[in-house]
């Protein structure tokens, strides 16, 4: 499985992005639980899930910064 591209995350709406972040955090929690109980079959999924979470949170932060810049520019 190839790592997902950040362009895919940028295409999501704000609501979809928030849902995807929550789902990815839940998946990471489940993977940690599986690892603790020694049921983890694919340890590389940690890398993929953390990578995806980083991408999603980066896109979320980019949008926050863009909104802040718009607000600051509209005040001037």
Curated annotation (Swiss-Prot):
InterPro entries, alphabetized: Ribosomal_protein_uL29 (IPR050063), Ribosomal_uL29 (IPR001854), Ribosomal_uL29_sf (IPR036049)
CDD domains with a match to the protein in the record: Ribosomal_L29_HIP
Family: Belongs to the universal ribosomal protein uL29 family.
The protein, known as: Large ribosomal subunit protein uL29
Gene3D superfamilies: 1.10.287.310
Record's keyword annotation contains Lipid biosynthesis: no
Keywords: Ribonucleoprotein, Ribosomal protein
GO-annotated cellular components: cytosolic large ribosomal subunit
Molecular functions (GO terms): structural constituent of ribosome
Keyword Ribosomal protein belongs to the record: yes
Species: Gloeothece citriformis (strain PCC 7424) (Cyanothece sp. (strain PCC 7424))
Gene Ontology BP annotations: translation
């Amino acid at each position: 499985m190839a790592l997902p591209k950040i362009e895919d995350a940028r295409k999501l709406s704000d609501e979809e992005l928030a849902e995807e972040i929550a789902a990815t955090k839940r998946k990471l929690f489940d993977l940690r639980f599986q690892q603790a109980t020694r049921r983890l079959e694919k340890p590389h999924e940690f890398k993929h899930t953390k990578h995806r979470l980083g991408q999603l949170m980066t896109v979320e932060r980019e949008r926050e910064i863009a909104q802040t810049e718009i607000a600051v520019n509209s005040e001037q």
